[in-house]
Structure formats: C-alpha cells, structure tokens
Amino acid sequence: QADVGLALGTLYGNVFSQTTICRFEALQLSFKNMCKLKPLLNKWLEEADSSTGSPTSIDKIAAQGRKRKKRTSIEVSVKGALESHFLKCPKPAAQEITTLADSLQ
C-alpha cells in the first residue's frame, strides 16, 4: 500500500499515504476522496498490467523504496537542559520556548 501511494505520487504528482490506500480498499473514504483516487488507481493499474514482463517506471519506483526522514539527534547536554526545564515547567509559553531555544544554540 505504501509503495502504491509512492508510485502514484511519482507518476502523477499526488502522493497518497498507506492509510489512504488502505481506507480506499476498505471503502472507508469519503465519496469525494474516492472519486479523486479511483481514476488515478485505474490508470496506475492499467499501466502495471500492460507492462508485465518488461521493466518500467513502476518497477524503478518500487526499487527506490520509500525515502525516510533523517533521524533527529540531540546532544546530551542539550537534552539534559531541555529535560530539566520541562520538569520545572511542563507547559511553557511560546516566548519561553523561544528563549530556551536561543539559549541552547
């Protein structure tokens, strides 16, 4: 399902999540969203069926896999400062967060 969503995005410009494809299969999307997704899926299926046996753009997309976001890493000293601040004040205001961020840079 994730690969289908990625393939749709690469081929037609609309990336759909695995959840959206799953909900489409289970008929749990709104009528409007079903109408938007059905023509794209039909087109993708026709292309996939017509290209059996020969490598195509769909095969290339599947080989690429889903791009993953880079994992965020926080320095130990910064993590300690954040944890101690949020223990003192679990719900800081926006200005406090900005001040804290500036002090940690």
Curated annotation (Swiss-Prot):
POU-specific domain residues: 1-49
CDD domains tied to this protein: homeodomain
Gene3D superfamilies: Homeodomain-like (1.10.10.60), lambda repressor-like DNA-binding domains (1.10.260.40)
Chief location category: nucleus
Regions recorded as binding DNA: 67-105
Keywords for this protein: Activator, DNA-binding, Homeobox, Nucleus, Transcription, Transcription regulation
Subcellular location: Nucleus
Sequence similarity: Belongs to the POU transcription factor family. Class-3 subfamily.
Protein's name in the database: POU domain, class 3, transcription factor 3
Organism encoding this protein: Xenopus laevis (African clawed frog)
Gene that encodes it: pou3f3
